[in-house]
Design a protein with these regions (language model features):
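Transmembrane beta-barrel wall of Gram-negative outer-membrane proteins
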Residues: 170-202, 214-263, 290-294, 464, ...
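Outer-membrane beta-barrel signature, preferentially recognizing the C-terminal barrel domain
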Residues: 405-411, 486-535, 539, 557-569, ...
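Short, acidic, small-residue-rich periplasmic hinge/interaction motif at the N-terminus
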Residues: 11-62, 82-84, 90-94, 129-131, ...
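Short acidic/polar hinge/loop motifs at secondary-structure boundaries
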Residues: 69, 75, 103-130
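Outer membrane beta-barrel strand-and-loop segments of large Gram-negative receptors
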Residues: 354-358, 401-404, 514, 520, ...
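Surface-exposed extracellular loop regions of Gram-negative outer-membrane beta-barrel proteins
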Residues: 148-163, 202, 206, 220, ...
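N-terminal periplasmic accessory domains that precede
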Residues: 69-72, 111-113, 128, 140-162, ...
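Extracytoplasmic beta-strand/coil segments of soluble accessory domains associated
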Residues: 47, 70-107
Length: 730
């Protein structure tokens, strides 16, 4: 996906000169003449193929100028992100998002709300790294999307106000303000936003199993969930320029997120076609969370920018309390049993404390050779407690010791890395290696058993990048890349506390999960700014995947390690101007993925299956008079395999109309999932059971976004924090 880049040199009067230099031209036999200025008219390339990443420049195309960052990501065909925060890059999941190299410490709807709070006009570029270099954390099998902002200001005040509201079946809004004030040595920045996101889930699920040789058991389930999230985001930052070469910055980030959910669940149990009993459950869930993080950053740049030194000190505190009240009424059929009621109350506090330090050193040794090196050290501690009460009457509940648990884990992570980059004629090569040592101390207390253990792990993560530029002027090049990645278990997925959707449907973490290792290889041909085609190969070991377990009437979702997952994909990006004001962009991918696992003592999952799939994204961008643009997006994918689960084909259509009143003021009208076709149909095939489900969510949304910016911008250097990789595990 890219735009052709046309450059035109134009002579303009000196009175129109802005931030340009006069140029002297001399030809033999002619007098010297001064051209007041040479102005390059036309955009920079929208997509720039660098050695280890693809750089998207939103300012090079009006399709990416209006709205917010969430809308910009949705306008890039190789990226897929929805309102729930599910994200993929080139068809790969497990993607990390960073802002100016810093982790956001957000996932799901909280991440979506934060991206919507960043106006598109503040974006400098977006770096897409399917295989990040050694400098970046090895966390995340799907790669990294680094959003780079125009961050500093000139002397004076710069601010931004954004207002957004949308409605499907339920209302949503996201409003905020950011301010930056710059002085000679000091600069202060702050931002504040409030948001509300609401959704509903209508689920129709059918479970079929044979838990004995002669009985065919069917459970029909209808779920209706409605949730809303009230979110408050705040940031304060202070930067002091020590001298021309060094600066120090202190920043504080705060998040408060209050999640509430009401669920109604109806289950009908039948054996050999005869209805046996029915249950009706009502769940009231509250899950408030708080996050505080502090970062101290030091930056030094040597003369002529031939060397640079950076240090980061970080602290993060994350806490949540999941509380649930579940009421179930059981009605037996054709039985002497009486109608029964059961009440369940659960309280599950969870907390994470992280402390980290990171240092980076860069040195340009010669015109064609440069190197980088650095270190990272983290200590993180997470703990949770599961407390449950049961009873047949709400006022007479007693502790349920069979569900009680305590989980505590301390992790130490130390890492060092180095990168070497060399240019040889048409070749550009980058070699790197990252060494990580991790130590885990885990303590789990159940009513029936206690588990204490210590695990140590050392891994090397090599990276290799090479690009051969066939024709410099045309932009044709061949690129090859290899890298090893790691995906550590999500903290909540280690949490052994049980969450009940209803008495027969639950989710439970797995404290025995191991880290997932992935080997990634990419081969790509780039044909200038018009199109590129690539081959991607991935080999996962101990792949972390959700699995489904069914025993009699009880259905449990949890996570397990799958011994081996292999995938191969061919993908293509393109961008073409059809007429003067009409652009077409596209991304297509054909992929084969295969899962294989043999049961062991700790993992009883048996799976050996693969599937071919196709996905495509197509976008049309139309420029209209009066600085208006229309974006029409279509996406389609065939069956997708996730371990035991096959997700059926899915099609979506989106439309956006943008009006740019000035460089500072814009208004965007958006319509997502116009035909409400985002209906998730799943087929889960397990050992002795089949599950079929259909889920409808609040995906057809009409929104209006207003953005106003005032003040001056100035580019700031990219900074990375020491606690990379932790965001995806919160």
């Amino acid at each position: 996906m890219a735009l052709p880049c046309l450059l035109l040199a134009q002579i303009v009067p000196k009175t129109k000169q802005q931030l340009t230099d006069s140029t002297m031209l001399r030809n033999n036999g002619y007098d010297s003449k001064r051209i007041d200025t040479v102005l390059v008219v036309g955009p920079r390339p929208l997509e720039e193929q660098l050695l280890d990443r693809v750089r998207i420049r939103p300012g090079s195309n009006p399709v990416l100028l209006n709205g917010n960052t969430f809308a910009v990501l949705n306008a890039i065909p190789s990226i897929a992100v929805d309102e729930l925060g599910n994200l993929s890059l080139q068809g790969k999941t497990g993607v990390l998002i960073t802002i100016n190299g810093k982790q956001t410490y957000l996932t799901g709807t909280s991440l979506v709300g934060y991206l919507k709070s960043i106006p598109a006009s503040s974006l400098e570029s977006i770096d897409l790294m399917t295989i990040p270099p050694a400098k970046w954390s090895a966390e995340g099998a799907g790669g990294v999307i680094d959003i780079r902002l125009k961050k500093d200001v000139l002397k004076g005040l710069k601010g931004n106000v954004f207002l957004g509201a949308s409605k499907g079946r339920l209302w949503k809004y996201n409003n905020g303000v950011s301010l930056q004030y710059g002085m000679k040595r000091w600069s202060l920045n702050s931002s504040f936003s409030v948001a509300r996101s609401s959704n509903y889930f209508d689920v129709d699920r059918k479970r079929e199993l044979a838990y004995s040789e002669n009985v065919h058991y069917v459970i029909g389930q209808l779920n209706k969930e409605t949730n809303n999230t009230q979110e408050l985001n705040g940031r304060l930052g202070m930067n002091y320029r020590i001298d021309k070469q060094s600066s120090v910055e202190l920043s504080w980030n705060y998040l408060r997120n209050n999640y509430e959910e009401i669920g109604v669940y109806q289950n009908d149990f039948s054996a050999d076609g005869t209805l046996k009993q029915s249950t009706a459950s009502t769940s009231n869930l509250r899950n408030p969370l708080h996050r505080n993080s502090i970062n101290l950053h030091y930056d030094f740049a040597g003369e002529n920018k031939n060397k640079a030194l950076q240090f980061d000190f970080d602290y993060l505190r994350y806490s949540s309390i999941r509380k649930q009240d579940l009421k179930t009424r059981t009605v037996p059929f054709f039985s002497d049993q009486q109608e029964q009621q059961q009440f369940l109350h659960s309280n599950n506090p969870f907390s994470v404390d992280l402390l980290g330090i990171k240092g980076d050193f860069q040195r340009k040794l010669s015109g064609s050779f440069s190197m980088e090196a650095g270190f990272q050290a983290n200590r993180s501690q997470r703990q949770s407690y599961g407390h449950y009460q049961k009873g047949e009457k709400e006022y007479a509940m007693a502790d349920d010791d069979s569900l009680e648990n305590t989980f505590k884990q301390t992790e130490y992570l130390e890492a060092i890395y180095t990168d070497f980059q060399l240019k040889l004629a048409e070749w550009e090569i980058k070699l790197g290696v990252r060494a990580e040592y991790a130590q885990f101390q885990t303590k789990i207390d159940y009513i029936d058993r206690n588990t204490n253990g210590r695990k140590q792990m050392f891994n090397l993560f090599p990276t290799v990048f090479g690009i051969y530029r066939i024709a410099e002027n045309s932009g044709q090049a061949v690129q090859v890349a290899y890298g090893r990645r790691i995906s550590r278990p999500n903290y909540q997925d280690l949490n052994p506390s049980i969450f009940f959707f209803d008495p027969s449907t639950s989710y439970q973490g797995n404290a025995q999960l191991s880290a997932q290792l992935s080997d990634n290889m990419d081969l790509k041909y780039v044909h200038g700014q018009k199109w590129n085609i690539g081959l991607s190969l991935i080999n996962h070991r101990n792949y972390i995947s959700m699995v489904h377990q069914l025993s009699e009437q009880n259905y449990t979702q949890t996570y397990q390690n799958i011994a081996g997952v292999k995938s191969a994909a061919i993908s293509m990006n393109m961008g073409k101007a059809i007429v003067k004001n009409l652009m077409l962009y596209g991304f297509g991918q054909i992929q084969y993925i295969h899962y294989k696992n043999i049961p062991t003592e700790l993992n009883d999952l048996l799976i050996n299956r693969g599937i071919w799939s196709f996905q495509g994204n197509f976008m049309m961008h139309l420029n209209l008079p009066y600085q208006m643009t229309v974006n029409w997006t279509n996406s389609y994918r065939t069956n997708v395999l996730y371990a035991q689960t096959v997700i059926k084909p899915l099609y979506e259509m989106h439309l956006a109309v943008n009006k740019q009143f000035s460089n500072a003021l814009s208004l965007a009208l958006t319509a997502r999932d116009l035909f409400h076709s985002r209906v998730l149909k799943r087929e889960i095939l397990g050992q002795g059971f089949n599950i079929y489900s259909k889920t409808v969510v609040d995906s057809r949304i009409i929104g209006l976004n207003f953005n106003y910016t005032f003040g001056l911008y100035k580019k700031q250097k990219i900074k990375q924090t020491s606690i990379e990789g932790e965001v995806s595990r919160l």
